[in-house]
Amino acid sequence: SVGLVGSEMCIRDRPTRAEVSDVATAIYEGADAIMLSAESAAGLYPVDAVQTMDNVAIEVESDPTYREIIEASRNARRNSVADGIVSAAREIAETTDIKAISCYTQSGTTALLIAREKPCVPIVAMTSEIETARRLSLTWGTNTVMSGAKQRFKEAVVSAVRGALSEGYASENDQIVITAGVPFNIPGTTNILRVAPCNERMIYSMDPE
């Protein structure tokens, strides 16, 4: 979902209280994105409008109540293997020192399922499909990394780790959770969860091909 704010900042450098409240409420409710339209396209204060939106988002997400509300909103039905995998990924991330959840996704469905769980760590969506990457660009908590098609599990683990490192979510001493599907490169096959070190030497010495 995308939250759309009012248009007061088309002509003024500050929003009304109602507009700030609308933006904050959208974020508290777990909106994937908050959107400006005329304020940035034709308004007199486009930079101020963007900065105001950013400030409100940062303030809301730093509120301890925000996580409580987000966690209380988890009520989706879980009927598939993929549902169970992403739920487990979120629980592992919340109970251990995990820095990110990396998921391989062709259609974008797995990334959306993880975003629905609203984990406390960043989501890194690994995909070889540019259209999928574009669709996921506004998804809650998700950053997309383009990745070539994978044929082997170890190759997929290494690529996911490199994606988390390149985005600054983890260092070599950290761990991430990886979800994927075997056989690779086929939509709807998410069936693997792996907790992986971000040290490639350890991966090559421990992981199967």
Where are the predicted features?
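Glycine-rich phosphate-binding active-site loops on the catalytic face of alpha/beta enzymes
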Residues: 22-46
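C-terminal binding/interaction regions
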Residues: 162, 171-184, 189-202
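Nucleotide-binding motor/catalytic cores of P-loop/tubulin-like NTPases across gene-expression machines
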Residues: 110-112, 118-155
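Long, charged amphipathic helices and adjacent flexible linkers at domain junctions
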Residues: 53-90, 206-209
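Single conserved hydrophobic/aromatic residue that forms the stacking wall/gate
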Residues: 1-6, 10-11
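Phosphate-interacting basic helix/loop segments used at nucleotide- and nucleic-acid interfaces
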Residues: 84-98, 157-168, 174
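Flexible, glycine/charged-enriched surface loops at secondary-structure junctions
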Residues: 37-38, 43, 62-73, 99, ...
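C-terminal helical cap(s) of enzyme catalytic domains, especially alpha/beta-barrels
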Residues: 40-63, 192-195
